[in-house]
C-alpha cells in the first residue's frame, strides 16, 4: 500500500466512479442505478449507503443534506460529491490495475495477436 493511497475495494471504486460521473447532486439511488446499468453489478441500497459513509470517513467524498422534500415525505436527501482526494484515489487504483495488466493478454499491445 502506497503512503497516502490505501487500496480501494472493488465496491468503493465503483461507487467513487459513479459519484464522479453523476457530479453534484449524486445520491444513493442514482449511484446504485448507474453501477447496475454500466457495470452490471447489482448492489443493495444498504451496501451503497454504507460504502458512501465509509468513503466519507476516509475523506474521499463529502456530503450535505437537501431541504426536506415532499416527495420523500418531508425527509431530506443526502447528496455526495468527490473531494480531490477521492479523484486521486480512483486514479491511483486505475494506475495499479494498468501496471499489473501490462504484459498480459489484457494489455492493449498483447491483444494484437
Tell where the protein language model's regions lie, with residue ranges.
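N-terminal helix-turn-helix DNA-binding core of bacterial DNA-binding proteins
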Residues: 5-47
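N-terminal hydrophobic signal/anchor transmembrane helix of membrane proteins
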Residues: 1-3, 92-93
